[in-house]
Amino acid sequence: MTTSAPEDRIDQVEQAITKSRRYQTVAPATVRRLARAALVAARGDVPDAVKRTKRGLHEIYGAFLPPSPPNYAALLRQLDSAVDAGDDEAVRAALRRAMSVHVSTRERLPHLAEFYQEIFRHVPQPNTLRDLACGLNPLAAPWMGLSDQTVYVASDIDARLIGFVDAALTRLGVAHRTSVVDLLEDRLDEPTDVTLLLKTLPCLETQRRGSGWEVIDIVNSPIIVVTFPTKSLGQRSKGMFQNYSQSFESQARERSCRIQRLEIGNELIYVIQK
């Protein structure tokens, strides 16, 4: 068996992944990058590489969503009804329901108002706010206290999710741009005032060691907000606070970055000034 990953075999793995309802809307760049590494690990065995690629996608994406894709159309109809009724509480309730389908935002719901109030107490009001690997974070825009002039720039590897985020922000009247972006493949040098990287670095590090700070270094923002979970998806701490804080703060010192550390709920927060 070959230890290289010829393009035709990468194509075969990609085609198998796109037939999967669970992963068919993941960015092709992400699928091909994982497929290439999987083929090398599988010594060119395509069926084995497909399994490895799906396993990789589960770790960085699938584990955070329900087994079947969320019914974004139904969630959008609920939001539409609330917006049309002009009922702010109903709008927020619809947004909370939508955010609850993604583990990352669901974990934040009990502390949602406090979370963003505390962050934006340490961050100047941005004209442009970029949210990388955004998941359903942009649906929390009403809790962020952003000005009407702020442009929310959101991206993720899931085209289906990004389509929903785009539609939801449009309904909310939030100025925005959305795109499908792979943080390890695509350009990240668009200038923005503030960038959010919420619970993203651990997923990057599972794909390529050191890539978390590579992304931070490349991102063209004077202020970056990075967060880490302090409990696993199974709600075990496993020393995560200590591990993440020691490693991250060591890297920040090497780069002479100014950081502020916060902790809200099960989330460790760093406000970085580059």
Curated annotation (Swiss-Prot):
Protein EC: 2.1.1.179
Source organism, top-level taxon: Bacteria
A molecular function (GO) term: rRNA methyltransferase activity
Catalytic activity: guanosine(1405) in 16S rRNA + S-adenosyl-L-methionine = N(7)-methylguanosine(1405) in 16S rRNA + S-adenosyl-L-homocysteine
Gene3D superfamilies: DNA helicase RuvA subunit, C-terminal domain, Vaccinia Virus protein VP39
Annotated transmembrane regions: none
Enzyme class: transferase
Binding residues for S-adenosyl-L-methionine: F64, H102, V103, S104, R108, A133, D156, D182, L183, L198, Q207
InterPro entries tied to this protein: rRNA_MeTrfase (IPR025981), rRNA_MeTrfase_GmN_bac (IPR010769), SAM-dependent_MTases_sf (IPR029063)
One GO process term, biological-process aspect: response to antibiotic
Signal sequence region: none
Sorted UniProt keywords: Antibiotic resistance, Methyltransferase, rRNA processing, S-adenosyl-L-methionine, Transferase
Family: Belongs to the methyltransferase superfamily. Aminoglycoside resistance family.
Other information: Protects M.echinospora, which is an antibiotic-producing bacterium, against self-intoxication.
Function (record text): Specifically methylates the N(7) position of guanine 1405 in 16S rRNA. Confers resistance to various aminoglycosides, including gentamicin and kanamycin.
Protein's recorded name: 16S rRNA (guanine(1405)-N(7))-methyltransferase
Source organism of this protein record: Micromonospora echinospora
Protein's gene: grm
